[in-house]
Regions:
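Core SAM-dependent methyltransferase catalytic element
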Residues: 262-287
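A short acidic, Gly/Pro-enriched loop at the edge of an enzyme's catalytic core
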Residues: 49-50, 193-208
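Conserved beta-strand signature within the Rossmann-like core of class I S-adenosyl-L-methionine
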Residues: 207, 240-249
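Class I S-adenosyl-L-methionine-dependent methyltransferase module
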Residues: 2-14, 25-26, 81-181
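S-adenosyl-L-methionine
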Residues: 1-48
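Conserved class I S-adenosyl-L-methionine
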Residues: 49-58, 73-76
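Conserved SAM-binding loop of SAM-dependent methyltransferases across substrates and taxa
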Residues: 58-70
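A short glycine-rich, Lys/Arg-flanked "PGG" loop and its adjoining helix->strand segment in the class I
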Residues: 221-240
Length: 287
């Protein structure tokens, strides 16, 4: 009998089990192993005692928030692989010291494998740091991989750059490792348009990566209407003085000009001068 993890990995779920995507992101796309954003652009503010919502993606936004003192993180993504990739990476950080962690990540990038071989089975090594659901997913993945039913890049996309993360430095990695002992991430399978229906709290900080860039793909009426719906939905779960952070790889969208008239947000941005292309981080602060 095929279990739910095989159905997930083999993309056999029925339409009723799939999450409607408001953007072009899919339910079963390979999940980024690393961010492709310059995380150093984000402000280094103290996030202790803040309610935080992040996009899941590679897990790096949640990890960056934890590095800056955040401890209670809600994380959402329409991609149902993202939470498992994030959880595995976090388990490895908890298990391994700085050099051992990045040595294993080099194996991943060079061999396109999680190094499930005779030298070490990473999943068994980090099992105590995975919950039951996460362990069963990765155990099923390995079973299917050995039997040539799935491949590494069906689940994980090694595109990105670990050096763009603040925790790529030993001092920050060790701080993150300590902070993870008191941190909790709750994952939601949700698209951005539905997240306000799936959570039961309000947030001080929201980190959306480049999701809004996809929502506001052009300044045509259709996309502007979508953008206004998304921001209006997020506004319902934001506390006074909260901030939404986003990333823009094209530096063309008008995030402040297309705001609904009944909403009041202050817009700010910082460009990445060393990226070689136009990229920026922007913030929408609730006034």
């Amino acid at each position: 009998m095929i279990n739910k993890y095989e159905k997930l990995l083999l993309n056999m779920n029925s339409n009723k089990d799939k999450i409607t995507s408001f953007t072009s992101f899919g339910n079963f796309d390979p999940s980024y192993l690393w961010t492709n954003e310059d995380m150093k652009l984000y402000p280094k503010e103290n996030l202790k005692d803040k309610n935080i919502l992040t996009i899941t993606s590679s897990g790096d936004h949640a990890l960056n928030a934890i590095l800056n003192g955040g401890s209670i993180i809600d994380s959402f993504d329409v991609n149902q692989f993202s939470k498992y990739v994030s959880a595995l990476k976090i388990a490895m950080i908890k298990k391994y010291d700085y050099y051992d962690f990045f040595k294993r990540m080099d194996w991943i990038e060079n061999v396109e494998s999680l190094n499930f071989n005779s030298r070490e089975n990473i999943i068994d090594s980090v099992r105590k740091y995975l919950n039951h659901d996460e362990y069963l997913f990765w155990s099923t993945f390995e079973y299917l991989r050995i039997n040539n039913k799935v491949h590494f890049n069906d689940v994980i996309n090694v595109y990105g750059n670990l050096k763009k993360n603040v925790y790529s430095k030993a001092l920050s990695y060790n701080k993150l490792k300590r902070n993870l002992k008191n941190a909790k991430i709750t994952y939601y399978d949700s698209d951005i348009i539905d997240i306000e229906k799936n959570v039961n709290k309000k947030y001080d900080r929201v980190f959306l990566s480049n999701v809004l860039e996809y929502v506001l793909a052009t300044n045509t009426p259709h996309f502007v209407d979508n953008y206004q719906k998304v921001i209006s939905g997020l506004d319902k779960i934001l506390l006074p003085g909260s901030v939404i952070y986003g990333y823009d790889f094209s530096n063309v969208s008008k995030y402040s000009d297309n705001m609904s008239e009944h909403l009041s947000y202050k817009y700010d941005e910082a460009s990445c001068k060393s990226c070689g292309v136009q990229q920026k981080i922007f913030s929408l602060s609730k006034v």
